[in-house]
Amino acid sequence: PVCSSAASDVYKRQIVMIVAGPNARKDYHYNETEELFYQIEGSIVVKTQQDGKLVEVPINEGEMFLLPPKIPHSPVRSEGSIGLVIERKRTNNDKDGLMWFSDTANELLYEEYFHLTNIEKDFLPVFKRFYSDEKLRTCPKTGEVMEADSRYVSD
C-alpha cells in the first residue's frame, strides 16, 4: 500500500540488469541517459571517453557510480564480479551507440548509432559489421589493426 504503485511505475520506466564478470568486450556504449552502476561483489573499472581522453573509473564492492548521459563507456568486469546496472528505458527519440577506440592511440575507429529496443539483439549486427571489416578496425593515426573477435566474424 505505501508507495507500491509508485515503485511499480518507476520499474516500468527502467531497465534493470544483473551483470557478472568476466567480460571480454572492447566496445564503448553511448547512451543518451544516465546509467547507475552498483557493485554487489568484486570490483570493476568503467573505461570512459571524456574530452578525447580515456578516463578509468574504479567501482569497488558496495560502491555506486552514476554515469552522466552521453559518456561513452566500457565496463571491464573481473572474474567473479557481480553488478547491478539500471538504465532508463528508451523513448522513440533516444539513440544508443557503439564505438571502438584504438588501444595505443585512443583514436576513434568506428561508431554507429541506432534506436535500442532489445540489447540482446540490437548490438549483434553492429558487432558483426565492425569485426568483419578490417578497414573499420584500422587506426587512422597509427595503422594498428584491432584484432577481430571470432564470436562476431562469419566464416
Regions found by a protein language model. Give the residues of each.
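A short beta-strand-loop-beta hairpin characteristic of the jelly-roll/cupin
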Residues: 30-61
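Double-stranded beta-helix
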Residues: 79-155
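Conserved short histidine dyad/triad with adjacent acidic residue
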Residues: 16-31
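Short, charged/polar surface micro-motifs in flexible loops or helix N-caps
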Residues: 12-13, 22-24, 43-45, 89-91
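Short hydrophobic/aromatic-rich beta-strand segments that constitute the beta-sheet cores
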Residues: 17, 46-48, 85
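Conserved metal-binding segment of the jelly-roll/cupin
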Residues: 19, 58-79, 88
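Single conserved hydrophobic/aromatic residue that forms the stacking wall/gate
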Residues: 1-7, 11
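Short, conserved, surface-exposed binding loops centered on an aromatic residue
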Residues: 9, 29-30, 38, 58, ...
